[in-house]
Amino acid sequence: MRVIGGNFKGKKIFTPTDKSTRPLKDMVRESIFNIIEHAKNEYVNLDNGVILDLFSGTGSFGIECISRGAKKVIFFENYINSIKVLKKNLDLLKLNEYSKIIEKDAYKISQAQIAVRKIDLIFLDPPFKDNKINKLIEIIKRMKITSKKSLIIIHRNKKIVENISKDLIVSKEKNYGLSKIIFGKIY
């Protein structure tokens, strides 16, 4: 696995040795960032942005954001093996000053933990078998941490049919292999 673009383009990052984490594939990550880059008027600009990466795993998405100019990424992860790899990746690229790791279940997120008023981009990548995505959308809406320019990106299994909460205004859906990427906003 490697960083796709930005200041750390081409740098390899570590992945877990066990099968319990499903790292976001390079191709899918690259496609997500191409969509963000080519829709700057519609979506947030990553430069100096604050990113919330829920179910961070190895941190590949958040690291990509920092590489492309984000000033801060808040990583939420509660699986110990993933946390170890995430910390190793941040140390490897010397990104600790740009990051905050919260070692908790993403469903227990609170305003006090993230300690910022507005988030520019929120990436939700729960386990594919997890069916509580709407609960997270509800929590995020209740916390009032998004603005009109904030972007929500959700990574799901395209084979799983879900009714996404009406609180998320979906602007785009793309399929890549087994992955479905949903782009939207919460007002």
Name the predicted role of every residue range:
Residues M1-Y187:
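Class I S-adenosyl-L-methionine-dependent methyltransferase catalytic core
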